[in-house]
Swiss-Prot record:
Subunit structure: Homodimer.
Pfam families cross-referenced by the UniProt entry: GAD, tRNA-synt_2, tRNA_anti-codon
Annotated keywords: Aminoacyl-tRNA synthetase, ATP-binding, Cytoplasm, Ligase, Nucleotide-binding, Protein biosynthesis
Protein name: Aspartate--tRNA ligase
Residues that bind ATP: 215-217, 224, 478, 530-533
Source species of the chain: Pseudothermotoga lettingae (strain ATCC BAA-301 / DSM 14385 / NBRC 107922 / TMO) (Thermotoga lettingae)
């Protein structure tokens, strides 16, 4: 036995016991010839006293074994911040397992951390830090909690293939060349979507999986090329059934991991409600700032730009930022104007009161009466700011949504506490792709459309067809997304046809699914939740990299291993691959 106790286990009740501890030396102190070590493992820290005749040369972060006796600390040295703070271990024997050959790039016990890329390059050192290991442990608890909940509710965990067929309808696939069949490729799954539908057809009526997924997409600030999702699918169910089981899981999770009781029923907002109220389909409602249609206050005004927008069917919308006038500088207004223009808007308007009688802001000289009218309706007080935008409603919603998000993140962190969890439903089934010059599925092409909408708009305006889809949003993040699925081959063919996929393309990409539908498919639906994002929210960290053991950078690089990297010519020859174009030597 290499240890009898962990470094976070011993208490005053253990005084007098002979124990064996093992771990890393966090720090060393020499007080008048008596050496004190702080020994650390993932469970905690324990103070060690070395005898004066101990001649071993010890370094920080050495991995050691300590055999000794637990003794009570002198009253004046008790550390109430440590679980083991009332005791120390007098070392009778020290065994060094390994010792650093050189100084570490950084030390886990230090408060000042290096750049993130250094932390990721030496992630094995970073993982020794308590806050990092605690997040990995929390991730484990989240996963176990979800597995237990779903298992108790009749779901079974089934593994689906990682090496599968490329069906590019969405992000790019990661491709894996086949050595045994040169010139052909597997794809790593972007999700187990098709396989979980096939499981439903196979009678596995309640399935789940904690599964790795892969997307070769242009990375944004907080995306990873490989990520983990909690994948759920169920047969003979309605949308309400999926939402109910997911709500129960989330409530159980928050209670078990955070000891937080969530309210009875989660709110449900439609996609259109979200966009019209917050300018986003995943708003953080904790910051308030709900939008209002203020067009009626500007029907008569002296501002030509507003008149032009209203006369062409546009709107004027705005929201109130309470107690913000002292922060609304010209510099900030100019920045928000540029953001609005980059999103296709004409800029923003804003106003506040210098005093109960004096208005300041953009266009105040021409719009004083209009602003006063708005202020009366919205109960705008001294030191409040009203932000407005005029134009086509979709652009106005997008502009105000981005402005609202920036103001909330930058200035109202005090409001962004607790948890705001709700559903968004009735997403558009299709969106137009300028790049492909056709309508594509906003979610995926296997989503069941609103059948009344399909009948009404399929020959006129596909953008008006709603999907039987839903997202769960937590604190401004889309944590999960799902839908009721199409289970009829003819309806699925019709959706592919509306997306202008040829019969040949459909057969090549999805023929196996359509064939399966012919042999009896039950009504089914499901949802996939991002484990990385959910854990990050529970841990209260801003990036999913903090809850992944070995994450990649925002550019998809692994600083630890150097991946992606070149491979040798022999490997390429075996795969019958010839490199061409621009590639790294």
């Amino acid at each position: 036995m290499l240890r009898t106790h962990t470094c976070g286990e011993l208490t005053i009740k253990d005084v007098g016991k002979k124990v064996i501890l093992a771990g890393w030396i966090d720090r060393i102190r020499d007080l008048g010839g008596v050496k004190f070590l702080m020994l650390r493992d993932r469970y905690g820290q324990t103070q060690i006293i070395l005898s004066q005749n101990c001649q071993i040369n010890l370094r920080r972060e050495s991995v050691v074994q300590i055999e000794g006796v637990v003794q009570k600390r002198p009253e004046e040295t008790i550390n109430k911040d440590l679980l083991t703070g009332e005791i120390e271990v007098f070392a009778e024997k020290v065994n060094v397992f390994s010792s650093p050959e050189k100084d570490l790039p950084f030390y886990p016990g230090e408060t000042k951390l290096p750049a993130e890329e250094i932390r990721l390059k030496y992630r094995y050192i970073d993982l020794r830090r308590k806050e990092v290991s605690d997040r990995i442990i929390t991730r484990h608890k989240v996963t176990q909690c979800i597995r237990n909940y779903l298992s108790k509710n009749g779901f079974i965990e089934v593994e689906t293939p990682f090496l599968t067929k490329s069906t590019p309808e969405g992000a790019r696939d990661f491709l894996v060349p086949s050595r045994l069949k040169p010139g052909t490729f597997y794809a790593l799954p972007q999700s187990p979507q098709l396989f979980k539908q096939l499981l439903m057809i196979g009678g596995i009526d309640r399935y789940f999986q904690v599964v790795r997924c892969f997307r070769d997409e242009d990375l944004r600030a907080d995306r990873q090329p490989e990520f983990t999702q909690i994948d759920i699918e169920m047969s003979f169910n309605t949308m309400d059934d999926v939402l109910e089981i997911t709500e129960g899981m989330i409530k159980h999770l928050f209670k078990e991991v955070l000891q937080v009781d969530l309210p009875g029923k989660l709110d449900r907002l439609t996609y259109n409600e979200c966009m019209n109220k917050y300018g986003s389909d995943k708003p953080d409602r904790r910051i308030g700032m709900e939008f209002f249609d203020l067009s009626k206050h500007f029907k008569t005004c002296e501002y030509h730009a507003i008149n032009a927008e209203l006369s062409s069917g546009g709107v004027v919308k705005g929201f109130v930022v309470r107690d913000f006038a002292n922060k609304m500088s010209r510099k900030l207004a100019d920045e928000l104007n540029e953001i609005a223009k980059s999103l296709g808007g004409g800029g923003i308007l804003w106003f506040s009161f210098d005093s109960p009688e004096s208005i300041k802001g953009a266009g105040a000289k021409y719009l004083q009466k209009n602003y006063n009218s708005v202020a009366k309706e919205l109960s705008i007080n001294y030191n409040d700011v009203c932000v407005l935008s005029a134009g086509k409603i979709d652009i106005v919603n997008t502009v105000l949504g981005e402005v609202r998000k920036i103001l909330g993140e930058r200035y109202f962190s005090d409001l962004r506490k607790g948890f705001d969890i709700f559903w968004v439903t009735d997403f558009p089934m299709f969106e137009y792709s300028e790049e492909e010059n056709r309508f594509v599925a906003q979610h995926h092409p296997f989503t069941m459309p609103n059948l009344d909408d399909l009948k009404k708009y399929k020959n006129s305006d596909l953008s008006k067809i709603r999907a039987q889809s839903y997202d769960i949003v937590i604190n401004g993040f889309e944590v999960g997304s799902g839908s009721i699925r199409i289970h009829d081959a003819e309806l699925q063919r019709e959706i592919f046809k509306l997306m202008r996929l040829t019969e040949e393309e459909v057969k090549l990409k999805f023929g196996f699914l359509l064939e399966a539908f012919q042999y009896g498919a039950p009504p089914h639906g499901g949802i996939a939740l991002g484990l990385d994002r959910l854990t990050a929210i529970i841990c209260g960290v801003p990036t999913i990299r903090e809850v992944i053991a070995f994450p990649k950078t925002s550019s998809g690089i692994c600083p630890l291993t150097g991946a992606p990297d070149v491979v040798n010519q022999k490997q390429l020859d075996e795969l019958k691959i010839i490199l061409g174009g621009d590639h790294c030597e």
